Design a protein with these regions (language model features):
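A short glycine-rich beta-turn/N-cap micro-motif
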Residues: 43-48, 67-72, 97-101, 110-114
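N-terminal interaction modules that seed assembly of large macromolecular complexes
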Residues: 24-52
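Long terminal segments
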Residues: 1-33, 90-155
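Generic beta-strand structural signal
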Residues: 41-43, 64-66, 91-93, 107
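A structural detector for short beta-strand units
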Residues: 32-40, 58-64, 101-105
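Beta-turn initiation residues at beta-strand->coil junctions
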Residues: 50-55, 62, 72-80, 103-106, ...
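Residue-level signal for glycine
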Residues: 44, 56-58, 68, 81-83, ...
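Long amphipathic alpha-helical scaffold regions
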Residues: 76-97
Protein backbone atom coordinates (compact mmCIF):
# COMPACT_ATOMS: atom_id res chain seq x y z
CA UNK A 1 0.00 0.00 0.00
CA UNK A 2 1.31 3.45 -0.90
CA UNK A 3 1.83 6.05 1.83
CA UNK A 4 -1.00 8.53 2.35
CA UNK A 5 -0.67 12.22 3.28
CA UNK A 6 -3.30 14.86 3.96
CA UNK A 7 -3.75 18.56 3.30
CA UNK A 8 -6.51 21.12 3.07
CA UNK A 9 -6.33 21.01 -0.74
CA UNK A 10 -4.12 20.37 -3.78
CA UNK A 11 -3.19 23.50 -5.75
CA UNK A 12 -3.17 22.26 -9.35
CA UNK A 13 -1.49 25.28 -10.95
CA UNK A 14 1.49 25.24 -8.58
CA UNK A 15 1.44 21.46 -8.01
CA UNK A 16 1.64 21.80 -4.23
CA UNK A 17 -0.35 20.76 -1.19
CA UNK A 18 -1.91 23.64 0.71
CA UNK A 19 -1.93 23.45 4.50
CA UNK A 20 -0.62 19.93 5.12
CA UNK A 21 -2.31 18.25 8.07
CA UNK A 22 -1.77 15.19 10.19
CA UNK A 23 -4.02 12.15 10.16
CA UNK A 24 -5.99 13.14 13.25
CA UNK A 25 -7.00 16.50 11.77
CA UNK A 26 -7.92 14.89 8.44
CA UNK A 27 -9.99 12.24 10.25
CA UNK A 28 -11.85 14.96 12.19
CA UNK A 29 -12.55 16.81 8.93
CA UNK A 30 -13.82 13.59 7.34
CA UNK A 31 -16.13 12.90 10.28
CA UNK A 32 -17.41 16.50 10.20
CA UNK A 33 -17.99 16.41 6.43
CA UNK A 34 -15.42 19.17 5.91
CA UNK A 35 -13.23 19.23 2.79
CA UNK A 36 -9.69 17.85 2.73
CA UNK A 37 -7.26 16.34 0.22
CA UNK A 38 -5.54 12.98 0.21
CA UNK A 39 -2.11 12.72 -1.43
CA UNK A 40 -1.09 9.24 -2.51
CA UNK A 41 2.55 8.19 -2.58
CA UNK A 42 4.19 11.46 -1.55
CA UNK A 43 3.35 14.71 0.22
CA UNK A 44 5.20 16.71 -2.46
CA UNK A 45 5.04 14.62 -5.66
CA UNK A 46 1.96 12.42 -5.35
CA UNK A 47 0.93 10.00 -8.10
CA UNK A 48 -2.69 10.72 -7.27
CA UNK A 49 -4.69 13.16 -5.18
CA UNK A 50 -8.24 12.83 -3.91
CA UNK A 51 -10.37 15.83 -3.04
CA UNK A 52 -12.92 14.84 -0.41
CA UNK A 53 -15.53 17.56 -0.88
CA UNK A 54 -18.33 16.08 1.18
CA UNK A 55 -19.75 19.54 1.84
CA UNK A 56 -20.35 19.77 -1.94
CA UNK A 57 -21.45 16.11 -2.14
CA UNK A 58 -18.58 15.22 -4.45
CA UNK A 59 -15.17 13.57 -4.64
CA UNK A 60 -12.52 14.49 -7.20
CA UNK A 61 -9.63 12.19 -8.11
CA UNK A 62 -6.62 13.40 -10.10
CA UNK A 63 -3.88 11.15 -11.48
CA UNK A 64 -0.52 12.83 -12.05
CA UNK A 65 2.28 11.87 -14.40
CA UNK A 66 6.00 12.08 -13.54
CA UNK A 67 5.96 15.81 -14.33
CA UNK A 68 3.01 16.51 -12.03
CA UNK A 69 0.55 17.03 -14.88
CA UNK A 70 -3.01 15.87 -14.26
CA UNK A 71 -3.58 13.45 -17.12
CA UNK A 72 -6.72 11.77 -15.76
CA UNK A 73 -9.51 13.15 -13.59
CA UNK A 74 -12.56 11.45 -12.09
CA UNK A 75 -15.50 13.24 -10.54
CA UNK A 76 -17.86 11.33 -8.28
CA UNK A 77 -21.08 12.59 -6.70
CA UNK A 78 -22.53 11.34 -3.44
CA UNK A 79 -25.89 9.68 -3.97
CA UNK A 80 -26.29 9.26 -0.23
CA UNK A 81 -23.85 8.89 2.64
CA UNK A 82 -22.89 5.40 1.52
CA UNK A 83 -22.62 5.47 -2.26
CA UNK A 84 -20.86 7.45 -5.00
CA UNK A 85 -21.53 7.61 -8.73
CA UNK A 86 -18.85 8.45 -11.30
CA UNK A 87 -20.33 11.37 -13.26
CA UNK A 88 -17.30 12.51 -15.24
CA UNK A 89 -13.90 11.32 -16.42
CA UNK A 90 -11.41 13.49 -18.31
CA UNK A 91 -8.25 12.29 -20.05
CA UNK A 92 -5.67 14.86 -21.16
CA UNK A 93 -2.79 14.62 -23.61
CA UNK A 94 0.15 16.99 -23.35
CA UNK A 95 2.78 18.53 -25.54
CA UNK A 96 5.48 19.66 -23.13
CA UNK A 97 3.52 21.55 -20.43
CA UNK A 98 0.40 22.37 -22.45
CA UNK A 99 -2.74 20.30 -22.86
CA UNK A 100 -3.27 19.59 -26.56
CA UNK A 101 -6.27 17.26 -26.32
CA UNK A 102 -8.88 16.62 -23.66
CA UNK A 103 -11.51 13.92 -23.82
CA UNK A 104 -14.34 14.16 -21.29
CA UNK A 105 -16.91 11.46 -20.61
CA UNK A 106 -20.08 12.63 -18.86
CA UNK A 107 -22.18 9.84 -17.36
CA UNK A 108 -25.62 9.75 -15.82
CA UNK A 109 -27.34 7.04 -13.81
CA UNK A 110 -29.86 6.33 -16.59
CA UNK A 111 -27.06 5.18 -18.91
CA UNK A 112 -26.64 8.27 -21.08
CA UNK A 113 -23.07 9.13 -22.07
CA UNK A 114 -21.75 12.33 -23.67
CA UNK A 115 -18.19 12.28 -25.04
CA UNK A 116 -16.46 15.60 -25.75
CA UNK A 117 -13.08 15.73 -27.48
CA UNK A 118 -11.50 19.15 -27.27
CA UNK A 119 -8.50 19.82 -29.51
CA UNK A 120 -6.75 22.95 -28.31
CA UNK A 121 -4.41 23.97 -31.12
CA UNK A 122 -6.11 24.71 -33.41
CA UNK A 123 -9.29 24.67 -31.36
CA UNK A 124 -11.91 22.14 -32.37
CA UNK A 125 -14.70 20.52 -30.34
CA UNK A 126 -16.31 17.20 -31.18
CA UNK A 127 -19.26 15.81 -29.25
CA UNK A 128 -21.16 12.56 -29.51
CA UNK A 129 -23.84 10.94 -27.40
CA UNK A 130 -24.17 7.28 -26.61
CA UNK A 131 -25.39 4.90 -23.95
CA UNK A 132 -23.54 2.71 -21.46
CA UNK A 133 -24.21 0.30 -18.60
CA UNK A 134 -23.96 2.47 -15.46
CA UNK A 135 -23.42 -0.50 -13.12
CA UNK A 136 -19.63 -0.03 -13.03
CA UNK A 137 -19.90 3.66 -12.12
CA UNK A 138 -21.11 3.03 -8.57
CA UNK A 139 -18.59 2.94 -5.72
CA UNK A 140 -19.03 2.74 -1.98
CA UNK A 141 -18.29 6.04 -0.25
CA UNK A 142 -14.82 5.65 1.26
CA UNK A 143 -14.31 5.23 4.95
CA UNK A 144 -11.56 7.48 6.27
CA UNK A 145 -8.17 6.14 5.16
CA UNK A 146 -9.58 3.62 2.65
CA UNK A 147 -9.35 5.25 -0.77
CA UNK A 148 -8.33 2.22 -2.85
CA UNK A 149 -11.59 1.96 -4.81
CA UNK A 150 -11.29 5.59 -5.92
CA UNK A 151 -7.73 5.08 -7.21
CA UNK A 152 -8.64 2.60 -9.96
CA UNK A 153 -7.26 4.00 -13.20
CA UNK A 154 -8.99 1.57 -15.54
CA UNK A 155 -12.74 1.90 -15.18
Amino acid sequence: MLPVFYSKSWFRAKKIALEPMDTSIARARHQAGAPYAVLIGSATTPSCFIEMLMDKRMVGVGFLDDEGREYLTYQFHYLNGEQLFLTMATHREFEVAKVILGTTYIFNQQGTLVIRREHLNPYRLEEIQSTFDPTGNYEPAPAFGDYSTLMKINR
